[in-house]
Amino acid sequence: MLKDEYGRVVTNLRIAVTKKCNLRCFYCHKEGESNPGEEISAERIVEIARAFKELGVRKLKITGGEPLLRKDLPDIILNLPEFEEISMTTNGILLEKYAEELRECGLSRVNVSLDTLDAEKYRWITGGGEVQKVVNGIEKACEVGLTPVKINMLVLGGVNDNEVDELLEFTNSFNRGNTKAILQVIELVPFPGFEKYFFDISTIEEKYARMATQRRVRAMHRRTQYFTPKGVIEFVKPMDNTAFCMHCNRMRVTSDGKLKPCLLRNETITIDGKHGEELARAIIETVRKREPYFKG
């Protein structure tokens, strides 16, 4: 079991398999990477994943950049050890093309970033992306069983803060008898230069909390899922949130193969050249030293 000095058990691993992306979203935090080096190899991804699995990690999430830009991604997924869940975060542009193959290789489900259904607004946010490709990708993911699809909507003040109802209606259109899609509403981390887009999503959450017919509190950051007549919706508030940090159960691996204990900190731990027991010891020690960014 991987546990830090605050009693937080690491059960989830996020591996950024590439720094490359086919969109240019103006707010992107690049998984906390500032100057990534050489891209991690497929063999090293599998080796690190196996080390974490042997130390008790149960779930793996593949991130980027845009993971679908790696041509060897199907082989990577095929060679991963067996986790309770292997999921992937994607912008969805290439998802329609690869969804079925990735499902056959062992991918469990996907998170798809979609901040708006408005074509012009989407093009502006993403630096030229086509929203219909994302919609097609979500439809394909639901069709082949990469479910539940979580649609990640980052709320941007003055841009899309009035579009939650529309995105939830779109999300719920896939739920015919069972939950195939969930809307995940995310509060912006106001990194320098983006403060003007920050929007406190508490008021939106209060609205859906009032109409919820059922609630489920997830272990991940103690987040609440609301089951409403309009669909299933969840809220992610990372800023100034001690509960978010005190229930953090994840570790990150950067696209150049370093350990990153916290998204909001610049610290990375080099594990180059470490294998077997030496790699395991490095992981254990890195986890042990983790600290919450926001403390009570």
UniProtKB/Swiss-Prot annotation:
One of its GO terms (biological process) is Mo-molybdopterin cofactor biosynthetic process. It holds the Pfam family Fer4_12. NCBIfam families: moaA_archaeal, PRK00164.2-1. Binds 2 [4Fe-4S] clusters. Binds 1 [4Fe-4S] cluster coordinated with 3 cysteines and an exchangeable S-adenosyl-L-methionine and 1 [4Fe-4S] cluster coordinated with 3 cysteines and the GTP-derived substrate. One of its GO terms (molecular function) is GTP 3',8'-cyclase activity. PROSITE patterns: MOAA_NIFB_PQQE (PS01305), RADICAL_SAM (PS51918). S-adenosyl-L-methionine binds at Y27, G65, S113. Its EC number is 4.1.99.22. SUPFAM superfamilies: Radical SAM enzymes (SSF102114). Residues 5-230 form the Radical SAM core domain. Its cofactor is [4Fe-4S] cluster. Pathway: Cofactor biosynthesis; molybdopterin biosynthesis. This is Probable GTP 3',8-cyclase. It comes from Archaeoglobus fulgidus (strain ATCC 49558 / DSM 4304 / JCM 9628 / NBRC 100126 / VC-16). Catalyzes the cyclization of GTP to (8S)-3',8-cyclo-7,8-dihydroguanosine 5'-triphosphate. Keywords: 4Fe-4S, GTP-binding, Iron, Iron-sulfur, Lyase, Metal-binding, Molybdenum cofactor biosynthesis, Nucleotide-binding, S-adenosyl-L-methionine. It catalyses: GTP + AH2 + S-adenosyl-L-methionine = (8S)-3',8-cyclo-7,8-dihydroguanosine 5'-triphosphate + 5'-deoxyadenosine + L-methionine + A + H(+). GTP binds at R14, K61, T89, K150, R250, M251, R252. The keyword Cell inner membrane does not apply. [4Fe-4S] cluster 2 binds at C245, C248, C262. Belongs to the radical SAM superfamily. MoaA family. It comes from the Archaea.
